[in-house]
């Protein structure tokens, strides 16, 4: 019996071994087949694009110098974004190709071509450039927005969409945002009580800073703030550093295109970004480190804000999903990405509305009709505030926060708008050019909210890319809901709670642009007078 068992076992083992070998052979054959098919497809694509490169021309553009391309023009004609805009205007084109060093930069101001890139060829243009400023701000590419298309990006984007910026999380954080909407009214009302004008830029930027700090850290201030509800020195440093970093990130730095010059800082941008990044981290990281320790020690057991969510995320083995560096850098990127768009749109919208009282009156009338004058406007009212949202949407169109969107790098050769775009090219959508394109927008320089009104609900997203709000595609902003909420609530509270006029002795708000960025040259300032019953205004911060 023992011999039979042994023989059977030997036979079974032999059969298993043979079966295993057969399976291995099958796997190898399948793998080989897939590899051959993939290679054939790649070769066909390569041949197709080689043919395309012969059949389709490169986009028009200035003649590059040998080796350095159009770097001399980039340096000579600062700010570079205005030179590019004028170049495209002079060439009468909605797409061009400018060579900086070995990099092909492709600005686009046509919505049809923009949709080709972010919709039809979204997968091809999903990469990001590797440059020093992006590497610095992301802690070595640990985040989402500026990170190349790789596994780290996929991991962090999944965290954001499923755990941080989801509709359920948005609802969970409602009360924190509501506190900051009340705080905004408290601050502006105190300016009136002190007979001061309201600097809308300060109010808007620090509302945004307060909201994201409250959602992230459960605190409005790093320090004590000011008695009137305004920002303290720490908050001013924080927000100023964020806007400085944004100004120089993808700011046509010489070393972005001639990387062998990295570290020499020939145009001074590298040092500026490093210092701004240090300021942001010096204020935020101690809070993050303290909270991580509280969870590790068991001192903290309940989630209260987004920082708690980041820290308590677990992988399939029950271990922390994110390490401290990933948490710190992703939080820094969220801070940088949250404040600028809402603040810029509201500042410009308020300037335009104060200068056009008939439009301001229509927005106020809508608020009185939808909300009434017996309570303050709330997030639940947003779907019904079409005119208010149209005012914000028109500010996005006419006065974008940045000249260009974050670059989309081509991961392979492509044909866009009947032009050949080589692999490695940076496609940059011109927010300025798209929103002011006369082929898309009649009378494009006129601020006219009513061009956005239709029979349905007005939304701030713009998937047809006739202008850029939160972009679209796999590299689009994942926080459109939060952005829409912040912008609409900020603008609605300002308009519902106060009557706005130019400051005393001023007949019209100056709406000229800064030379080196797209903010108003002079911060929008107005005189705000309460228009509701006194008991509706918050009396404490």
UniProtKB/Swiss-Prot annotation:
PROSITE patterns: CYTOCHROME_P450. GO terms for molecular function: heme binding; iron ion binding; isoleucine N-monooxygenase (oxime forming) activity; monooxygenase activity; valine N-monooxygenase (oxime forming) activity. Residues 42-541 are lumenal. InterPro entries: Cyt_P450, Cyt_P450_CS, Cyt_P450_E_grp-I, Cyt_P450_sf. It is found in: Microsome membrane. Its cofactor is heme. Residues 1-18 are cytoplasmic. Heme binds at residue 477. It catalyses: L-valine + 2 reduced [NADPH--hemoprotein reductase] + 2 O2 = (E)-2-methylpropanal oxime + 2 oxidized [NADPH--hemoprotein reductase] + CO2 + 3 H2O + 2 H(+); L-valine + reduced [NADPH--hemoprotein reductase] + O2 = N-hydroxy-L-valine + oxidized [NADPH--hemoprotein reductase] + H2O + 2 H(+); N-hydroxy-L-valine + reduced [NADPH--hemoprotein reductase] + O2 = N,N-dihydroxy-L-valine + oxidized [NADPH--hemoprotein reductase] + H2O + H(+); L-isoleucine + 2 reduced [NADPH--hemoprotein reductase] + 2 O2 = (1E,2S)-2-methylbutanal oxime + 2 oxidized [NADPH--hemoprotein reductase] + CO2 + 3 H2O + 2 H(+). One of its GO terms (cellular component) is endoplasmic reticulum. One of its GO terms (biological process) is cyanogenic glycoside biosynthetic process. Signal peptide: none annotated. Pfam families: p450 (PF00067). Glycans are attached at residues 277, 505. Its EC number is 1.14.14.38, 1.14.14.39. The chain crosses the membrane at residues 19-41. Expressed in the epidermis, the next two cortex cell layers, the endodermis and the pericycle of leaf petioles. Strong expression around the laticifers among the phloem cells and in parenchymatic cells between the protoxylem and the metaxylem cells. In the leaves, preferentially expressed in the mesophyll cells adjacent to the epidermis. Involved in the biosynthesis of the cyanogenic glucosides linamarin and lotaustralin. Can use L-valine or L-isoleucine as substrate. Catalyzes multi-step reactions starting with two successive N-hydroxylations using L-valine and L-isoleucine as substrates leading to the formation of N,N-dihydroxy-L-valine and N,N-dihydroxy-L-isoleucine, respectively; following spontaneous reactions lead to the production of (E)-2-methylpropanal oxime and (1E,2S)-2-methylbutanal oxime, respectively. Belongs to the cytochrome P450 family. The synthesis of cyanogenic glucosides is mainly in the top of the plant and then cyanogenic glucosides are transported basipetal in the plant to the tuber. PANTHER family: CYTOCHROME P450 77A4, CYTOCHROME P450 98A9. This is Valine N-monooxygenase 2.
């Amino acid at each position: 019996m023992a011999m039979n068992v042994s023989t059977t076992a030997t036979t079974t083992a032999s059969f298993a071994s043979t079966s295993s070998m057969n399976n291995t052979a099958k796997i190898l054959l399948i793998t080989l087949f897939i590899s051959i098919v993939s290679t054939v497809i790649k070769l066909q694509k390569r041949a197709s694009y080689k043919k395309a490169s012969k059949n389709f021309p490169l986009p028009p553009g200035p003649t590059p110098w040998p080796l350095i391309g159009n770097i001399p023009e980039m340096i000579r004609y600062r700010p570079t974004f205005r030179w590019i805009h004028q170049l495209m205007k002079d060439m009468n084109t909605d797409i061009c190709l400018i060579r900086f060093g070995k990099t092909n930069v492709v600005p686009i101001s046509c919505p049809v071509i923009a949709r080709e890139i972010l919709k039809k060829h979204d997968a091809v243009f999903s990469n990001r450039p590797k440059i020093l400023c992006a590497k610095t701000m992301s802690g070595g590419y640990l985040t989402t927005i500026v990170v190349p298309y790789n596994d780290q990006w996929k991991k962090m984007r999944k965290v954001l969409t499923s755990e941080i910026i989801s509709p359920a999380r948005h609802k969970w954080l409602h009360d924190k945002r509501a506190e900051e909407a009340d705080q905004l009214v408290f601050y502006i009302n105190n300016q009136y009580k002190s007979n001061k004008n309201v600097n809308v830029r300060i109010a808007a930027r620090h509302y945004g800073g307060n909201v994201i700090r409250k959602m992230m850290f459960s605190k409005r201030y790093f320090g004590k703030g000011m008695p009137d509800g305004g920002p303290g020195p720490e908050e001013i440093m924080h927000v100023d550093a964020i806007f400085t970093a944004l100004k120089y990130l993808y700011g046509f730095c010489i070393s972005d295109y001639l990387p062998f010059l990295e570290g020499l800082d020939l145009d001074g941008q590298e040092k500026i970004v490093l210092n701004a990044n240090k300021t942001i981290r010096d204020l935020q990281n101690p809070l993050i480190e303290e909270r991580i320790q509280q969870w590790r020690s068991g001192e903290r057991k309940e989630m209260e804000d987004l920082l708690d969510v980041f820290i308590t995320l677990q992988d399939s083995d029950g271990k922390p999903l994110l390490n401290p560096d990933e948490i710190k850098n992703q939080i820094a990127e969220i801070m940088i990405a949250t404040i600028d768009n809402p603040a810029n749109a509201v500042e410009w919208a308020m300037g335009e509305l104060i200068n056009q009282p008939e439009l301001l009156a229509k927005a106020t009338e809508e608020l009185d009709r939808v909300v009434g004058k017996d309570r303050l406007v709330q997030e639940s009212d947003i779907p019904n505030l079409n005119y208010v949202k149209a005012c914000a949407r028109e500010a996005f169109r006419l006065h974008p926060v940045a000249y260009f969107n974050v670059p989309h790098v081509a991961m392979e050769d492509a044909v866009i708008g009947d032009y050949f775009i080589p692999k490695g090219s940076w496609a940059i959508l011109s927010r300025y050019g798209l929103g002011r394109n006369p082929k898309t927008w009649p009378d494009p320089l006129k601020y006219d909210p009513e061009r956005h009104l239709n029979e349905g609900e007005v939304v701030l997203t713009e998937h047809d890319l006739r202008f850029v709000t939160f972009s679209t595609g796999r590299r689009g902003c994942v926080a459109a809901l939060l952005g829409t909420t912040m912008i609409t609530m900020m603008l609605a509270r300002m308009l519902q709670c106060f009557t706005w006029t130019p400051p005393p002795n001023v007949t019209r708000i100056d709406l000229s642009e800064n030379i080196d960025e797209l903010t108003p040259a002079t911060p929008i300032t107005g005189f705000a007078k309460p228009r509701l019953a006194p008991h509706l205004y918050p009396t404490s911060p």
